[in-house]
Amino acid sequence: MTSLQVLSIISSFLTQGLPHPPHVAADSHYISKKDSISASVGRLTSLLPCLCALHAYGVGHRPFVIVDIFYAE
């Protein structure tokens, strides 16, 4: 998996909106900016173990720094 693929997975994970509750009509689905930011932070927090595992895997196979994902050429 290339760093670009990892970046696209992370970005899609962070930018997805939360699914609306079943009792709320789809056309009235709305997430305020504050809720969206807190949801993104929550999703990023849940990704941290995955990022740590990727980092550990990369250290064993080649020099790999998580920051490289965000600055991939």
Swiss-Prot record:
- The protein here is known as Uncharacterized protein TP_0539
Q: Which organism is it from?
A: Treponema pallidum (strain Nichols)
> What taxonomic ancestry is recorded?
Bacteria, Pseudomonadati, Spirochaetota, Spirochaetia, Spirochaetales
